[in-house]
Amino acid sequence: MKQQAKSRKPQQPEYIFQVETLSHEGRGIAHYGSHPDHPADKHGKKVFIRYALPGETVKAQITHEAKRLEEAEMVALLAEPSANRVEAVCPHYGICGGCSMQHIHPDEQICLKQNVLQSHLQHFAGIQPEQWLEPIRSLQSDYRRRARIGVRYLPKQDRLILGFREHHSNRLTSIHTCSVLDKKLSDSLPELRNLLQSLKGKAHIGHVELAKGDYETSLLVRHIEKLNNADVNQLRQFALHKGWQLYLQPKGPESLRRIDEEQGAMRLHYALNAFDVNFAFSPLDFTQVNATVNEQMVQLACELLQLQQGERVLDLFCGLGNFSLPLARCVGAKGQVVGVEASEEMVQRATDNAKRNNLVQASFFSQDLTKDFSHHSWANQGFDALLIDPPRAGAYEIMQYVPNFGAKRIVYVSCNPATLARDAGVLVQHGYQLKKAAVMDMFTHTEHVESIALFEKIQEIND
């Protein structure tokens, strides 16, 4: 570790532990009773130790006590380190709360994430895939193409903090580099902090957002009070110097405006070259932060669905069409892709993206998928295949409708293994079988588990 998040509190006890295994979020697990100094009344109690790895002997300071478990932070490694321990690449690791696994070898991170998915599938649904696919791996650094960065001005010190929240805290820690952020964006952080420090209205800036497309970069400044003309001009000159688009957002998303709109609309772009499609998006639109993993993910989804020319596909939670447009390429002009998304703005974005790529076989509808949608015409047309890419809450409300779609193949893309496992159990009840699954390292060095799963309808045999 490069740094420790906080100085040790003298009143909190320290003990020596033998670390046994890893928790789902990457903390070492140990038990009281493995050392003679342990309190007798705590023998057998579980301890979760931040930064500790299996097989290590560590000194740890207790940070939180509960009836059945305790939490601790490693303060010293007392013997040989685990073979899976590596040096964190970021100087802010241990203070910044963005990454939690930089001390773990990348292969072990992948292994842990697959174990998490496997455990959830077994616990919640009692199933395992017939085949585990090779994980989709990420670059180990410079992989994030967007970030929201907090801003806080300390008037007594006349100092502006630009950074991320500390681990389990609302307090910002100042950063001058970010090893997982796109290198050009990361290298710009000191210059950006100096710019914000020089503004008269710096106390009224809540955060900034950086987003990078294939060809453009945007800087969004969220401010709670109007910025004066001099400040806006300074921001404008900075953006012109960097070749960035500049956006100001004084209130909610509807207040977003681009400065110097004559230079173009509020758009950035990215391409999925394997499908010859190009997407336009706004700085506030949801896009996958990891371009490398996203392209591999979309390719794998299309391969798993084994689409044929002329087939019909339903894409639920379609967003701006990240899956829909490649799916439309796969089914060809005689096929059809129907994308459904709650946000009317994103539906319009997806429609525009389909038009710009001449994909007339893709159509989009706005619908809150947590509500009854059975009366809509698109829901009663029948489909050969279904793709579901829900938020963390999963797609439980949709599961009851799945038999009506008639899909032979379902690809479920998940950012939460618990809700994937829950929904998988319902799909099995509806006669689907989990054929293949893989983890995707969308957020490397963090505990977040992204995954993809293929379900196929079991063929009924008529006597």
Curated annotation (Swiss-Prot):
GO biological process: rRNA base methylation
PROSITE patterns: SAM_MT_RNA_M5U, TRAM, TRMA_1
Residue intervals of the TRAM domain: 6-76
Residues holding [4Fe-4S] cluster: C90, C96, C99, C178
Single GO MF descriptor: iron ion binding
Annotated residues for binding of S-adenosyl-L-methionine: Q288, F317, N322, E341, D368, D389
Role noted for this protein: Catalyzes the formation of 5-methyl-uridine at position 1939 (m5U1939) in 23S rRNA.
Name listed for the protein in its UniProt record: 23S rRNA (uracil(1939)-C(5))-methyltransferase RlmD
Gene source species: Acinetobacter baumannii (strain ACICU)
Gene from which the chain derives: rlmD
